[in-house]
Amino acid sequence: MEMTSAFTLNVRLDNIAVITIDVPGEKMNTLKAEFASQVRAIIKQLRENKELRGVVFVSAKPDNFIAGADINMIGNCKTAQEAEALARQGQQLMAEIHALPIPVIAAIHGACLGGGLELALACHGRVCTDDPKTVLGLPEVQLGLLPGSGGTQRLPRLIGVSTALEMILTGKQLRAKQALKLGLVDDVVPHSILLEVAVELAKKDRPSSRPLPVRERILAGPLGRALLFKMVGKKTEHKTQGNYPATERILEVVETGLAQGTSSGYDAEARAFGELAMTPQSQALRSIFFASTDVKKDPGSDAPPAPLNSVGILGGGLMGGGIAYVTACKAGLPVRIKDINPQGINHALKYSWDQLEGKVRRRHLKASERDKQLALISGTTDYRGFAHRDLIIEAVFENLELKQQMVAEVEQNSAAHTIFASNTSSLPIGDIAAHATRPEQVIGLHFFSPVEKMPLVEIIPHAGTSAQTIATTVKLAKKQGKTPIVVRDKAGFYVNRILAPYINEAIRMLTEGERVEHIDAALVKFGFPVGPIQLLDEVGIDTGTKIIPVLEAAYGERFSAPANVVSSILNDDRKGRKNGRGFYLYGQKGRKSKKQVDPAIYPLIGAQGQGRLSAPQVAERCVMLMLNEAVRCVDEQVIRSVRDGDIGAVFGIGFPPFLGGPFRYIDSLGAGEVVAIMQRLATQYGSRFTPCERLVEMGARGESFWKTTATDLQ
């Protein structure tokens, strides 16, 4: 048996070589540049052994095959040429695996992503487990890159160009059955027999390539290909607004390989990989990846977390139902919902049923697993079943007296160790805990709507919250699949505080005559997933504007909304999508209904709807106020670091990921340039644009928030 640091070669008695991948000291297998020589040494031995019948690659990790390439390798490249050389090295290694004269099979269990899937594609056959942990994909586009070790060339030839483009352009991950249906894998088996099935496949002749569906064969021809790339190009441009250069390069590289052959395709792939690695977009996206990984490792405090065996929820509304779902179905914890109205409990239970039933229909979940997860959720109209809950999340109406009453009731009806977590979006946690007998166990846990989709939670300790309460709440959030940031107990916390001036400015521009669709389109073009006016409609105008008076009382008139505009809209019974009318009008088909701007909105707010500003001018006014407020939050220690500030903005409100978050964006512009822009806007539009003191000082000194590397703070 030949040992290497990450690869073990074992030749079985039946002359099948099993190469076990196990990167020492790491939970996940990732490919590193230094492994190339190790793999080549093994390939040399395989070629020298004339008795071998086949080869199987398998992972020793319990839940991943290969999670991708080590992203630090890209960060270490100083030039496009260095990154291109890295890609060519990967391509060459995969080519050597593919060129082995005997069948090579990948036995896949767990994540098989990026470079891991490229290695599997270089094999002659693939078998994977039917485990939910098994996913296959090429997520490089999410880091502003493209697959650089042959993925753009091998995948289209294996599963067809249109399906391959969808995977590569979106980073979409396939489950086992989807992969089998598309021909990405040759078999799906239980984990217990994975290796034996792969070995048997390796004993046969090389698996012949499955004939592509007729549609894919047509699209691979010159006419079909031209039409496909034109259509996909238009769709991609509309989705990315031209902000992500990787998607354009992916289309170019895949088309080059199909039109000019694999040699030209591999060459184009390596060159594009090198160039994309040096783009500011890729650097920003990689910084978000590193920051989010870092946040997920952050325990929140130095104290050890308390055990978490069960959770209670007060309120069965939209938020309560969503929190119950992620607690039971993601965290796997028993949940007890209390609502004074049985209909509230039914609503919360139906919410989880709808989510899980959708997964069953899409064949992502077995019906038996759905029933098992639903069995974790129960309901009550009183406090029966709450006596031993470790943590109780309050998701009732946004009213201070009511929330204080909830604290008192929970303390009377739960254990001495029970934590009370409030899902408030605006009320100070210190005020909610004001009359608590155990204030050290009261904390804020702010989810964003819709709960099952939004990745961020804000965890808000008040001055008296214990370190263990913080650590335990952070632990729960991670179990729920969330990315938690710990923020200070100040009005608006972090996300809503930086969002409010952004939305206020959009409303102000409406009153000045800019059109709803122009404002929204300008911010989508800038890189936000939706514009500020549409966002307000989606959240609910009544809900979204409730925080403005709270912020105005705390921080003064820079948070003032345009006079009487919000009240005029609410008095006209406009709440947004939830009641079918806001700034937009909605059809009758729920969230998927088409919307159109309601022209009646302009006279209602006393505006003409005849704008004069360009899209960049509109975006500049909204975004600069957000940046200024984010810097104030650092200065006032509302957030613990600019890392948390960037993650909070990207994951909480969809700040453009390709800009890396507010603080990376300020660094890319230069603090001095941001100050100059804000001073110009202050002269034009008023003192709300006055740059904060910290920004002015940083601009004068030429300072930045981040160091030059993707992972370190100054």
UniProtKB/Swiss-Prot annotation:
Renumbered residue ranges of the record's region 3-hydroxyacyl-CoA dehydrogenase: 306-714
Pfam families: 3HCDH (PF00725), 3HCDH_N (PF02737), ECH_1 (PF00378)
Gene Ontology terms: cellular component: cytoplasm
Cellular localisation: Cytoplasm
Keyword Aminoacyl-tRNA synthetase (UniProt): no
Recorded GO MF terms: 3-hydroxybutyryl-CoA epimerase activity; enoyl-CoA hydratase activity; long-chain-3-hydroxyacyl-CoA dehydrogenase activity; NAD+ binding
Keyword match Lipid metabolism: yes
Protein's pathway: Lipid metabolism; fatty acid beta-oxidation
A GO biological-process term: fatty acid beta-oxidation
Keyword entries, A-Z: Cytoplasm, Fatty acid metabolism, Isomerase, Lipid degradation, Lipid metabolism, Lyase, Multifunctional enzyme, NAD, Oxidoreductase
Major subcellular location class: cytoplasm
Domain of life: Bacteria
Catalytic reaction annotation: a (3S)-3-hydroxyacyl-CoA = a (2E)-enoyl-CoA + H2O; a 4-saturated-(3S)-3-hydroxyacyl-CoA = a (3E)-enoyl-CoA + H2O; a (3S)-3-hydroxyacyl-CoA + NAD(+) = a 3-oxoacyl-CoA + NADH + H(+); (3S)-3-hydroxybutanoyl-CoA = (3R)-3-hydroxybutanoyl-CoA
EC number, as in UniProt: 4.2.1.17, 5.1.2.3, 1.1.1.35
Annotated site residue numbers, Important for catalytic activity: 118, 140
Region described as Enoyl-CoA hydratase: spans on this chain: 1-190
Recorded family membership: In the N-terminal section; belongs to the enoyl-CoA hydratase/isomerase family.
Complex formation: Heterotetramer of two alpha chains (FadJ) and two beta chains (FadI).
Function: Catalyzes the formation of a hydroxyacyl-CoA by addition of water on enoyl-CoA. Also exhibits 3-hydroxyacyl-CoA epimerase and 3-hydroxyacyl-CoA dehydrogenase activities.
This protein's name: Fatty acid oxidation complex subunit alpha
Native species: Escherichia coli O8 (strain IAI1)
Lineage of the species this protein comes from: Bacteria, Pseudomonadati, Pseudomonadota, Gammaproteobacteria, Enterobacterales
Gene: fadJ
